[in-house]
């Protein structure tokens, strides 16, 4: 078959030669020169077979995978030797640079007349294969260099996602929001056969967003904590729920419940199937795994309870007795504010197999029924409660927490499910309880003061989970079918309201006994804080008082220092004055010694009568009158004399027995004398002595009365004779005489009875005339001692005089002051009003 020259001269547009792969290397690379040398080796005249009878259209095109055409060495040598490649050589010489880089434009290539088209294709094929090989090498090299960086960035991205999820979970816990996970089931076979389409769009790169697209024009976005698509399995769903489940082991209350319309997969998510178990079983399995992991420090015990709310009645699903249908269970509120079902069975569990057995028993006893929407539709709300009690083995601290796993009955439309009879009644109760749940959610989202928890048994049981101290997770199950768009939209709106609830962060739940202890400790701490506040206030007041007293003390100290300084000044002044006074006294004494002549010796002194001109004048008398001592006043206490007692009859004085001898009076009349040495006594003159004693002109020097030594001779100046008594009344009746009347004979603090009675009773031999003889005469007057002190005069006893003095001269006050008071033995006692006026 001959070749057409026209087509051979101009290649067809579909020729692969112009469509060569562009170069992956820059024009200046060394590899291009090497390949140019190799190409020049191939440029030889083509063989006659190729030029003559070969059809260029049947030439093998270059392999896109880089397979080079098989050309033997003999053919290459023949082509070079034959010189059939002159046209190709001229082409390479003209377009060598462009050909090396495979950048020859196709229009330029079309205008070249090449007789050897096959050689050009071989050349381009080889060039393409070499470039492709170089490209693969570069890709492998880049992949080798970038693989570690890619792995690092991938790991960093995963860590950042985990950190963001952790921070988001912490934020939710701090805010107290209810976590909401949305799970969309796949379309069922019946829905696909009915021509239903999906109205839910989920972007795998945005795990928290969901697009609700009921039509091309309508589109609404919803945001949740996580969105699971139809392809997500049970393990993926539980992995996101794992942090909430683990918090039960730390002492927090947890509630996980599934909400949605009938047939959306709530029971499948919570319970699952034996081949692919749900959240309930996986959560309990995780709890047992954590208990074994922490067994060295914390001891855990588990108990499970399963109940259902059917037609607003609570049934215990673990009670298989025949009486359980008629048994009524009520909800009680405990002291710590949580809700408990009185009489509910709490079965202890020890292994995960025991958990599965209990769950199967509860699922068997649960109320289910067939509807047009679901053959095994749940006709009640199922609640699984797991109580976890833990005790720290080191500190002894105890906690009690629980986890609620709730599978709610599906909300449904009566006209759509086509139920009647008992199923219709069940649907009404289900919708009523779900409506009450919606009211509670709305009230919580609006933060109303009153939350209607008691409108339904379901909401009453979930009170602590929805609005209390609990971590809550909600699965909202939706259907992607366009036939259920209304129910899906309602479920999404309800889940959005639930996600907006903010009830504060959850707290650890302690054991009730521990709670009571904590309350007592809290009360004690509060009381101590009040006491501390009072003490602090008292301390502050004390500090203020102390500060004020410090100021007062400082002021007083200043005053004390000033007073001390003044005292020192005064003391200095006093010393100076004392020195001056001492000097003056010394000077006065010196002057007195020099001016006053010395006194003569006592034996050489002249008689008192001869120096009468030197007697100083008498000082004024200060008389102190007092009563005579009585028997009652034994202490000789001076008593002033009453005026009415001046006329009393002294002869009637009662004599008493004295315990002590009174020698000196208590009170003496001492006239004030100047401080001069004048020891001269005033004695009665000779005329006065003669007037008193007219019948006695000369007496002995000293008169004595011999008496026993233990006796005392004391007498009153008032004579016992009638004449003397009358004279006494005459003289003593005047005021002057009453003032001068003093008769006190006591020198002791013990008083003596009246001296007259004693003298009369013991010394009857002494007559009144002998008493008058006791007065000294003119002979012994110069030697009588007139002094306060006792003066003893030794001498012979005075002879008893028998002469009786007549007249009233003895009542003269001047003479009566000088009368002798008593005599004991050879000692005579006399009165003297002038102190230190004595002449021996």
Curated annotation (Swiss-Prot):
SUPFAM superfamilies: P-loop containing nucleoside triphosphate hydrolases. GO terms for molecular function: ATP binding; ATP hydrolysis activity; microtubule binding; microtubule motor activity. Signal peptide: none annotated. Residues 517-594 form a coiled coil. Pfam families: Kinesin. Residues 1-74, 581-617 are annotated as: Disordered. One of its GO terms (biological process) is microtubule-based movement. PROSITE patterns: KINESIN_MOTOR_1, KINESIN_MOTOR_2. GO terms for cellular component: cytoplasm; kinesin complex; microtubule. Gene3D superfamilies: Kinesin motor domain. Residues 581-593 have a biased composition (Basic and acidic residues). Keywords: ATP-binding, Coiled coil, Microtubule, Motor protein, Nucleotide-binding. ATP binds at residues 260-267. Residues 177-501 form the Kinesin motor domain. Belongs to the TRAFAC class myosin-kinesin ATPase superfamily. Kinesin family. KIN-14 subfamily. This is Kinesin-like protein KIN-14J. The gene is KIN14J.
